[in-house]
Amino acid sequence: MQSFETLEKLLGYSFKNQELLIEALSHPSLRQHHEYKYDKDYERLEFLGDAVLNLVVTEILFRNFASYNEGNLAKIRSYLVCKETICVVGTKLTLKDYIIMTYGEEVAGGRDNPNNIENAMEALIAAIYLDSNIETTRNIIGKLWEEFIKIQNLTDYDPKTALQEWAQASSHHLPIYRLIKREGAAHSSTFTVLVKVKDYEQTGTGHSIKEAEKNAARDLLHRLQDV
């Protein structure tokens, strides 16, 4: 297990109360085995962290997406606080290396379990909030989620770049575009392009290949917000 000091450097935050940090990283399996002598785990902090993350993300979207209506804001928030996004953030922090768990949980694959990474990440947010204040927590979440929020800003006017950044942020291969159909006369052709990222595919049409690629990327990004 790595030292907590390394994790704190990655977060850009040093805990005043180390007990909060330990609690945020303690898997529930520890309480089920008395030989480990842990009387707390991250479940209560996870509950609070989920609410804090939703509040902070909602506020960030409200301030930065003034032209978006309630429905669009809700879709973006769902994407930013979904399990996959939280897991990506936790993975970038190498959070799995810091979770304290029983030997049995570890050999069962618990360190790589996305649920454990998500839960610990939410608990860590709550621990930061309790150890500091909402402003500090807002700044840390803003930094950790920055690339995902940036993607939302790019989606409408530069969806190809937004999709590429989403792929990179999610540790996937870069998008692959393929022309699959061309219809109509030479001066008024309609092009259909297929874009693929990991297991996700989407088609888009346009009066040029560039336009078709842009539409495919935008539609795929909108789909990914609902995943």
Curated annotation (Swiss-Prot):
Q: Where does Mg(2+) bind?
A: 46, 119, 122
Q: Which CDD domains match?
A: DSRM_RNAse_III_family, RIBOc
Say yes or no: keyword Cytoplasm present.
yes
Q: Which InterPro entries match?
A: dsRBD_dom (IPR014720), RNase_III (IPR011907), RNase_III_dom (IPR000999), RNase_III_sf (IPR036389)
Output the Gene Ontology cellular-component terms.
cytoplasm
Pfam families, per database record: dsrm, Ribonucleas_3_3
- Which residue intervals define the domain RNase III in the entry? 4-133
Q: Catalytic positions?
A: 50, 122
MF terms from GO for this chain are: double-stranded RNA binding; metal ion binding; ribonuclease III activity; rRNA binding
Q: Where is the DRBM domain?
A: 158-226
The prosthetic group or cofactor this protein requires is: Mg(2+)
Tell me where it mainly resides.
cytoplasm
The top EC class is hydrolase
GO aspect biological process, one term: mRNA processing
Family the entry assigns: Belongs to the ribonuclease III family.
Annotated NCBIfam families:
RNaseIII
According to its UniProt entry, what is the function of this protein?
Digests double-stranded RNA. Involved in the processing of primary rRNA transcript to yield the immediate precursors to the large and small rRNAs (23S and 16S). Processes some mRNAs, and tRNAs when they are encoded in the rRNA operon. Processes pre-crRNA and tracrRNA of type II CRISPR loci if present in the organism.
Record text on subunit structure and interactions: Homodimer.
Q: Which protein is depicted?
A: Ribonuclease 3
Organism for this UniProt entry:
Rickettsia akari (strain Hartford)
Chain's gene name: rnc
